[in-house]
């Protein structure tokens, strides 16, 4: 076959490329065995590697879990007395839980990862074996105290096939579903709400309901209703989720919604588990350019029944309106207007007595306003942060207007900037606490130290007026801090990809180190052959900006050999994706064991750097930072002769699937082979919120310019496309349209269609085919004939990405 070839359970067939003889020893069965064993090889060998601490309510005590030889221990620390001890008698608890559950347990093999202290710390609760358990620490008795929460999963499934609970998590990266961040925030769900819902007024006298698409009130406990509106209809209805009473119960605001287009994606599940015949299903799924719901705020005066429709001059073309939020003194309510195209974001305040609206804050970037919340999450964050101080008389707001993500203090009465709080060539990553009394902000930031990794997270405190900037963490690494409830103490856990975690207890007042809690011990890991990734930087396309990445080599690395290179790509603009914190298991390592050097870096267009760095993605997702990536590769090759950039492969999932195929289409002179899983190959086919955020609205030629479908004819190298049949994140048709375009262009390619799989299409078969594809096309070695071999070990997952 010289067209699209469906892969089910057979090895890949293709022309063998010419490969230097020095590499012929790579890609052997022994290499596969090492790759398959990588998941479990280092399990339990990292000692004292802590990840997080948990403060106990409003106390000065906290607990954490740490790995030790033979298992794990729970540790309890009192910050006042500096006493550190086991959180409980592990052997006694294991005996009690064994007796109650019928499971054989030891003190170091307790199956739960998390505990909650209850009953004044005289007992602990945890979830295990499908139930919630309570264990008394006085007599070490355990009993079931309830069912496990719905969807709770105490440990990963036996294989890496995504489950219903975790099918949007692949290789530690969270994929956002089409419903998250979509166009409404409760108020614009597009459907009239059932009459049974009611919203009580703060004074307890009234209940607001929706009946026949209109707003009604009734005395609490009564059935007789009073109509506040009569202009609602099936095509222009009021929504219950938007109802907001003023705190003094004199006013009520609700949104009247004109529904947009209800697009659906259709699925045919070919091989359902519960029946022989296929199943058809649909899913609501808005796409770029679709007509959206349009919300109209309406204010009602309860005493007079007066209705005021708010003039929409300040919000004429909404992508979304946030639900109304009242000032505590009922003088006004606010909502946030996100204009279609994301080039105008506005905080609007409305006087309920007059219905007059005014703009308090305007964000009008030339490119896009990243409207998702400022989270502190390396891989998923936006810019939007708002904190209303003193009932909105001041507002703390995040903006990139000076070219970097910083905090500003607004006068909530005049709408004018009082002062910029943070400033400099670095970015605020999250706000942890706002202390109105002391007028201080506790926040996370990165990039403040020239020459250091600009993605490392550090913690700071600053005054509202921008003075008193104080660093609470200073050690070179990425930090994760948890504060006691009174902000008197903090636990600082920090690491790097090449440095095991260090956990310290410090005092906020003077940052004094009170107790070194743990220091990761890697001696056993090192004896077993573990090696950390190498951090590598190179200058990007502008000749001045550093591009940061990591290099992963096989554990049997031989510098006298030539190694083909495989790039793990995810270039979604919602975050940055090269690992910064320590991890024992790096799934890129398994792929490297086959005889490759595997790398990952963040090119321009990703987040957590300057606005200019981020803006490269605007209307240009096809760029994916490739100019920077290729320069980075060339810099590595210039330093290391064994780094063979004549044989570069690339793989990715979701937006990484789009980019990996895009690398083949737009840079065929550099990338020779790609595996693209669950790709959103044409941004007109994918979910509206993610794609319009970066590609803009209205749709234009720039969408086609970035489309892998429209550019499929450019394919020169070897491409494996993976499509999950039941992908609820990316429309499976996105991949199939690429296949169609490749067939029409008479381009050879490979296709794996995975029945029943959701986003990421995980599982050993998918991973093994990725291995085989690169072994075949980059090493020039024929993979094993798996049909004739026993299925010895499940491969580690090798997909990555986010969206």
Regions found by a protein language model. Give the residues of each.
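Bacterial N-terminal signal peptides
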Residues: 9-20
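Generic structural signal for short, solvent-exposed loop/turn connectors between secondary structure elements
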Residues: 20, 42-49, 129-131, 209-212, ...
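Serine-hydrolase catalytic core recognition
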Residues: 263-264, 322-325, 330, 336-338, ...
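Bacterial N-terminal signal peptides that target proteins for export
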Residues: 1-11
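Beta-propeller folds
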Residues: 23-501, 505-506, 523, 527-530, ...
């Amino acid at each position: 076959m010289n067209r699209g070839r469906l892969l089910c359970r057979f090895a890949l067939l293709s022309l063998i490329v010419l490969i230097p003889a020095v590499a012929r020893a790579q890609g052997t069965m022994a290499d596969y065995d090492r790759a398959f064993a990588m998941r479990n090889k280092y399990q339990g060998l990292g000692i004292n590697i802590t990840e997080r601490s948990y403060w106990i309510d409003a106390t000065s005590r906290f607990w954490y879990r740490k790995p030790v030889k033979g298992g794990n221990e729970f540790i309890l620390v009192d910050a006042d007395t500096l006493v550190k001890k086991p959180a409980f008698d592990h052997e006694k608890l294991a005996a009690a839980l064994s007796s109650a559950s019928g499971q054989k347990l030891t003190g170091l093999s307790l199956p739960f990862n998390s505990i909650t202290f209850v009953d004044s710390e005289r007992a602990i609760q945890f979830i295990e074996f499908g139930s919630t358990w309570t264990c008394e620490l006085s007599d070490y008795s355990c009993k079931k105290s309830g069912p496990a929460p719905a969807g709770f999963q105490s440990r990963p499934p036996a294989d890496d096939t995504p489950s219903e609970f975790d099918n949007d998590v692949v290789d530690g990266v969270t994929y956002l579903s089409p419903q998250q961040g979509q166009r409404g925030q409760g108020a614009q769900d597009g459907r009239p709400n059932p009459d049974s819902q009611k919203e009580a007024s703060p004074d307890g006298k009234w209940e607001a309901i929706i009946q026949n698409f209109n707003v009604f009130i009734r005395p609490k406990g009564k059935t007789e209703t009073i109509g506040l509106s009569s202009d609602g209809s099936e095509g222009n209805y009021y929504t219950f989720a938007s109802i907001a009473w003023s705190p003094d119960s004199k006013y009520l605001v609700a949104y009247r919604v004109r529904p947009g287009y209800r697009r659906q994606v259709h699925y045919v599940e070919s091989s359902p588990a519960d029946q022989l015949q296929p199943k058809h299903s649909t899913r609501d799924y808005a796409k770029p350019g679709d007509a959206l719901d349009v919300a109209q705020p309406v204010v009602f005066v309860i005493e007079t029944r007066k209705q005021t429709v708010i003039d929409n001059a300040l919000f004429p073309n909404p992508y979304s309106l946030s639900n109304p939020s009242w000032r505590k003194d009922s003088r006004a309510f606010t909502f946030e207007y996100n204009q279609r195209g994301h080039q105008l974001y506005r905080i609007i305040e409305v006087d309920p007595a007059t219905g007059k609206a005014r703009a308090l804050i305007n964000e009008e970037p030339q490119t896009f306003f990243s409207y998702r919340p400022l989270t502190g999450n390396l891989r998923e964050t936006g810019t939007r942060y708002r904190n209303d101080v003193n009932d909105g008389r001041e507002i703390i707001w995040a903006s990139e207007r000076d070219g970097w993500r910083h905090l500003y203090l607004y006068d909530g009465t005049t709408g004018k900037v009082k002062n910029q709080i943070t400033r400099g060539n670095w970015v605020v990553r999250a706000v942890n606490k706002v202390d109105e009394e002391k007028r201080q902000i506790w926040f996370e930031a990165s990039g403040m130290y020239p020459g250091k990794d600009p993605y490392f997270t550090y913690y700071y405190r600053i005054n509202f007026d921008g003075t008193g900037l104080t660093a609470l963490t200073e050690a070179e690494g990425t930090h994760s801090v948890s504060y006691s409830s009174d902000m008197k103490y903090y636990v600082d856990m920090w690491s790097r990809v090449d440095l095991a975690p260090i956990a310290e207890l410090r005092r906020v007042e003077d940052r004094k180190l009170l107790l070194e809690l743990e220091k990761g011990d890697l001696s056993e890991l090192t004896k077993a052959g573990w090696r950390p990734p190498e951090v590598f930087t190179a200058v990007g396309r502008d000749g001045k900006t550093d591009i940061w990445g990591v290099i992963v080599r096989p554990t049997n690395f031989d510098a006298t050999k030539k190694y083909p290179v495989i790039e793990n790509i995810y270039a979604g603009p919602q975050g940055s994706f090269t690992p910064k914190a320590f991890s024992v298991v790096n799934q890129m390592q398994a792929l490297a064991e086959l005889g490759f050097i595997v790398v990952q870096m963040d090119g321009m267009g990703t987040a957590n750097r300057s606005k200019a760095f981020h803006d490269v993605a605007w209307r240009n997702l096809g760029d994916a930072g490739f100019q920077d990536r290729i320069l980075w590769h060339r810099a590595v090759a210039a330093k290391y002769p064994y780094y063979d950039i004549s044989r570069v492969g690339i793989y990715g999932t979701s937006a990484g699937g789009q980019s990996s195929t895009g690398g083949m289409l737009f840079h065929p002179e550099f990338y020779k082979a790609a595996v693209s899983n669950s790709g959103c190959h044409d941004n007109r086919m994918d979910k509206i919120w993610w794609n319009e955020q970066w590609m803009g609205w209205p749709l234009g030629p720039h969408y086609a310019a970035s489309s892998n479908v429209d550019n499929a004819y450019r394919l020169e190298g070897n491409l494996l496309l993976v499509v999950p049949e039941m992908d609820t994140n990316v429309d499976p048709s996105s991949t199939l349209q690429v296949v169609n375009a490749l067939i029409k262009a008479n381009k050879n390619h490979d296709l794996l269609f995975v029945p029943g799989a959701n986003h990421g299409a995980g599982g050993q078969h998918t991973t093994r085919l990725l291995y085989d594809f690169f072994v075949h096309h980059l090493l020039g070695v024929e993979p094993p004939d798996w049909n004739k071999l026993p299925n010895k070990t499940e491969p580690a997952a090798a997909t990555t990405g986010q969206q």
